[in-house]
Amino acid sequence: MVTVLDAIANAPRLRHPEKAHKPDQEVLRKPDWIRVKAPVSKGYAETREIVKSHKLVTVCEEAGCPNIGECWEKKHATFMIMGEICTRACAFCNVATGIPTALDPDEPARVAHAVKQMGLSHVVITSVDRDDLADGGAQHFADVIRAIRAATPSTTIEILTPDFLRKDGALEIVVAARPDVFNHNLETVPSNYLKVRPGARYFHSIRLLQRVKELDPSIFTKSGIMVGLGEERNEILQLMDDLRSANVDFMTIGQYLQPSKKHHPVIRFVTPEEFKSFETIGRTKGFLLVASSPLTRSSHHAGDDFARLRAAREAQLQKSV
């Protein structure tokens, strides 16, 4: 006999249960400058096969990144560790929310093997938020970094981390593993936090980035925001100043794209000209590098940007001699 419990047990899992009760938001039509081609290349298919064969998760897929076709064609992928379920529910994010599973102790080795198989000279590792773990997943991040170093020592490593909010000693564990780039995104201006990023605290994120530099000045620090969420221009400029006060080296700015009708709406599409002006202003404020365009994302062109970062630092050091 089939009961209502059987129906519930077999029902598909809601990707965003916390958003199910929210009213639908209009999804604005994208302007021409945001259109991208569907991913159909041979390189894309090969990258997808490597990811699946190692049972790995990528933020490219989970977050619905518009650049997935371009990046995967070039065998570039951003690996998302610690599962595919996040303990937070940011209004902009397409990653699934809920109760995550236990950490997989074999994941560091599988990520390292995939990095070696793909021949990556630069790799980006990110994660879901794991507020359920005592260290927020810091030791797992460190284990992944060290596994990659052991498997392919020449590969440079960039990490995009959560904020490890209220996890004493977590940041120190990650920094001790010595990633080449430490990225932690502010995501938006502080006035938007309660509605866009309610589980985080703006000035905690600023302090985290500052603390990375205090612990190891040789590590490049990086942070990014989305625009089109209702922020004012002067708020973006103040955010730039806040990042520079924390000695952040690299800033990324991209257009927010609404994943579904249940997510925060796009308030407006920022023009390419405005993005260019943010890049110019950011450079005058002292960032070593600013990437600002409608399709800019944290790990888009990360390898090329790392080379530019190193060159910019060397040029800066030469000037100070």
Swiss-Prot record:
GN (gene name): lipA
GO CC annotations, alphabetized: cytoplasm
This enzyme's EC code(s): 2.8.1.8
Binding site residues for [4Fe-4S] cluster 2: 86, 90, 93
Annotated Radical SAM core domain residues: 72-288
Gene Ontology MF terms: 4 iron, 4 sulfur cluster binding; lipoate synthase activity; metal ion binding
Taxonomic lineage of the native organism: Bacteria, Pseudomonadati, Pseudomonadota, Alphaproteobacteria, Hyphomicrobiales
Keywords assigned: 4Fe-4S, Cytoplasm, Iron, Iron-sulfur, Metal-binding, S-adenosyl-L-methionine, Transferase
Record NCBIfam families: lipA (TIGR00510), PRK05481.1 (NF004019), PRK12928.1 (NF009544)
Protein name as it appears in the record: Lipoyl synthase
